[in-house]
């Protein structure tokens, strides 16, 4: 090698090292100014979490957040996280269009969800969000109400066998109902999960979320080569085979149906009203045929994402809601009275007007999501330095939000651990900071399916309340939940059911 070239390369490398070291030191100085929890080398703040039982981890986290609120620095491995809990700081982050990228933790989902709407960033996220958004147009959601109703009627019928039999576990019933709904509305396919009972897909998705939750909580499992040496990897691999097989089968069946019926959306469908009951999958398939805006891999990733977000989160929300109604018979009866006033003893399918008139039931649902948000953590990554709460947050820092902690702020919600639907009376909502309640996140990267989820819950609950009374067996203190991706109770929720007629 020419000596001049060698010296030039040496100088370049030397300067790069100096710049990197200088920037790293500057970053450390910025972070040291932020109040933080005790941290250890390599593992960071994770040790106190790891040696606690799963059911005690959230309690410890809430104690730390309470001590340092509204802003705290902690480390997972060598990665800095800044947790924020005041609505004012949350608004700064969630409204910032430069802070819409998800943190590195979401990379752990890539083997399953790829880079779908939940995990993607940059141009891909913007393109996919634009393609998918019309799927949740008002008139399309209205067309799904009959499907919500059909599956709710099956749930009512299935629960009949539990009448008079004592305590039973509710989660599997609502989980199968949610799976039936998401498959038919989003994929255009009936899987009959409620009638056929056991669902290999539901079992696989539950095991997969357990694996990913444990991996996210343990920085030692972040490196892929270490993860592959553990039993977690083999569980992950088996589950992925089931999940991919299930979703690929749905996609192929839908493609065949479209070929046979030749029913596709085209640019001639200018009237949005014509798009009623258009499955989410059809929107993706249309986009793949329209100048190849989406590849087959894109479709697989988005279907996985929608199935996960539209099934697990809704079934968790409905389970917790029944837990609360079973603990508060007076609230349950008030919701029943509202439903009865609307239906007048009829078992008919609700209309959109009916659902819009379920004001009390909507407050009940929102209050349940306040105490038991389906997703308990959101994390964003800063790609450039920015100011937050009087501190400079350096690029590369992860910004995280504990949704239950935010929702239980006594300065915003009096008696925050008490279930009180009046928290969502119009006069209280209008006087509350808009970022004090974020069960579906907020800002430009909020949950695209939140309206879908609320309508689904209203329909299902309107059927259940017309037919049954529920009483919760679990004690109030059993409302503790695990540190997992989806809000899961420490003790599975048991109910006693009584027929109204």
Swiss-Prot record:
Location, primary (coarse class): endoplasmic reticulum
Localisation per UniProt entry: Endoplasmic reticulum membrane; Microsome membrane
Source taxon at top rank: Eukaryota
Cofactor requirement: heme
Family named by the database record: Belongs to the cytochrome P450 family.
Record's protein name: Cytochrome P450 4c21
InterPro entries: Cyt_P450, Cyt_P450_CS, Cyt_P450_E_grp-I, Cyt_P450_sf, Cytochrome_P450_Monoox
Reaction catalysis annotation: an organic molecule + reduced [NADPH--hemoprotein reductase] + O2 = an alcohol + oxidized [NADPH--hemoprotein reductase] + H2O + H(+)
Main enzyme class: oxidoreductase
GO cellular component: endoplasmic reticulum membrane
Transmembrane segments: none
UniProt entry keywords in alphabetical sequence: Endoplasmic reticulum, Heme, Iron, Membrane, Metal-binding, Microsome, Monooxygenase, Oxidoreductase
Induction: Expressed at all life stages.
PROSITE patterns in the record: CYTOCHROME_P450
Disulfide bond positions: none
Enzyme Commission number(s) of this protein: 1.14.14.1
Residues engaged in binding heme: 309, 447
Any GO molecular function: oxidoreductase activity, acting on paired donors, with incorporation or reduction of molecular oxygen, reduced flavin or flavoprotein as one donor, and incorporation of one atom of oxygen
CDD domains: CYP4V-like
Membrane-protein topology: Peripheral membrane protein
């Amino acid at each position: 090698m020419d000596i001049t070239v060698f010296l030039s390369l040496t100088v370049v490398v030397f300067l790069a090292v100096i710049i990197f070291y200088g920037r790293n030191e500057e970053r450390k100085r910025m972070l040291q100014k932020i109040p933080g929890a005790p941290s250890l080398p390599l593992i960071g703040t994770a040790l106190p979490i790891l040696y606690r039982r799963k059911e005690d981890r959230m309690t410890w986290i809430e104690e730390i957040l309470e001590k340092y609120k509204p802003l705290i620095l902690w480390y997972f491995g060598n990665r800095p996280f800044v947790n924020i809990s005041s609505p004012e700081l949350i608004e700064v982050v969630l409204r910032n269009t430069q802070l819409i990228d998800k943190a590195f933790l979401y990379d752990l989902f890539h083997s399953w969800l790829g880079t779908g709407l939940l995990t993607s960033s940059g141009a891909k996220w913007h393109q996919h969000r634009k393609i998918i958004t019309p799927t949740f147009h008002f008139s399309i959601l209205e067309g799904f109400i009959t499907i919500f109703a059909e599956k709710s009627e099956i749930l009512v019928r299935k629960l009949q066998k539990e009448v008079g039999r004592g305590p039973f576990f509710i989660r599997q019933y609502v989980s199968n109902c949610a799976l039936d709904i998401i498959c038919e509305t989003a994929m255009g396919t009936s899987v009959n999960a409620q009638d056929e009972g056991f669902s290999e897909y539901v079992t696989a998705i539950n095991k997969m979320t357990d694996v990913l939750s444990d991996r996210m909580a343990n920085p030692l499992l972040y490196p892929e080569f270490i993860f592959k040496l553990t039993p977690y990897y083999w569980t992950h691999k088996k589950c992925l085979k089931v999940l991919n097989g299930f979703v690929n089968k749905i996609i192929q069946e839908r493609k065949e149906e479209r070929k046979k019926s030749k029913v596709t959306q085209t640019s001639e469908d200018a009237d949005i009203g014509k798009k009623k009951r258009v499955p989410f999958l059809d929107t993706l398939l249309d986009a793949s045929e329209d100048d190849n805006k989406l590849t087959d891999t894109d479709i697989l990733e988005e279907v996985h994402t929608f199935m996960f977000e539209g099934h697990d989160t809704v079934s968790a929300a409905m389970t917790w809601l029944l837990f609360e109604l079973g603990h508060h018979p007076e609230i349950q009866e008030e919701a029943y009275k509202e439903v009865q006033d609307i239906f007048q003893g009829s078992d008919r399918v609700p209309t959109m007007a009916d659902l819009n008139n379920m004001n009390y039931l909507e407050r009940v649902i929102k209050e349940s999501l306040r105490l038991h948000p389906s997703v308990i953590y959101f994390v964003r990554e800063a790609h450039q330095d920015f100011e937050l709460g009087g501190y400079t947050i350096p690029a590369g820092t992860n910004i995280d939000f504990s949704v239950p902690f935010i929702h239980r702020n006594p300065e915003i919600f009096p008696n925050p651990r008490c279930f009180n639907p009046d928290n969502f009376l119009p006069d209280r909502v209008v006087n509350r900071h808009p970022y004090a309640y974020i069960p579906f996140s907020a800002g430009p990267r909020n949950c695209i399916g939140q309206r879908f989820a609320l309508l689904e819950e209203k329909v299902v609950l309107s059927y259940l309340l017309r037919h049954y009374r529920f009483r919760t067996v679990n004690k109030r203190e059993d409302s503790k939940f695990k540190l997992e991706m989806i809000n899961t109770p420490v003790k599975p929720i048991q109910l006693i059911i009584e027929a109204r007629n």
